[in-house]
């Protein structure tokens, strides 16, 4: 096995409450068990790798690495770049016409003398890293790639719990605890809380659960119209089940009539297929990102749901609040910090042993923290809508159990 002399860190994709802390724990662990290993960070993810833009981990950074665990965001920056999307890389000026981004990135790693690449990102980030390692292996350059699973959607196979997701749910609940008070600014207020989650409803479920637990600890004064019912969650919609607008409006209308407001939690990916179909019928173009995913900020599920229910519930005011950026940029909570530290320290051990993969709780091995093999890494893991705690929450708020996927007309 080749001796590890130099490692590089790279964060990519959207933010999550684990990027800065993951790097902090990785640096600290290398400094503890392999102090002679040199370390660098590629600035702005794969963009920095393609451009040869990196920053050295100095002695000062080594000594104070754990400061990074108290912060959100990424100190070295992110970007959304797919190395196999040649057209996009050329368009953005990251490579010249005729160049293969994989080769450019591979050559940069070789020139920098990198033995281990630590990628912190979602399934796209880590499978791209696997492609890079495979490319280098064909060219007789043994690169060890050890990823950490970052996604607040918690939708990566076979990772039982992705880093930062618990924090994102907690922060989303805090966000709504404030903005829900806006329903007192207008009569018949419809408040939509749009939560991140392209294909998976886990974060929406968990955010609603955290929020309702916060309400459990909150004192109210019903005698002066300060009631829990007005601030509670009245509906939760996720991508894995359909929204029956007519049936739900019939259920929610009496609530609106009684408490003068309705509060809905909805995943940003709920009903997307139907919204896109409507956009295409109108001749509108649906923008996509570098990975071919529809730009959800352009699809705007929250606005769509708000408009449909606003009419059906005779709302005088419809407000859509998105907690995503607030939640994903937070520093990790104590529960996440423990998981991040365990995974980061395991990642260093794997790297020094020459073992590639994505380190996290392997749901196929009793949630043991280990390097999950790259061929098993895949996004789009759905939330289990049959989960007992989810169904119990729906029962508590008076919402029927979810049915098959897709939105009813």
What are these regions (language model features)?
Residues 27-32, 36-60, 130, 136-179:
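Glycine/threonine-rich beta-strand-loop-alpha-helix active-site module
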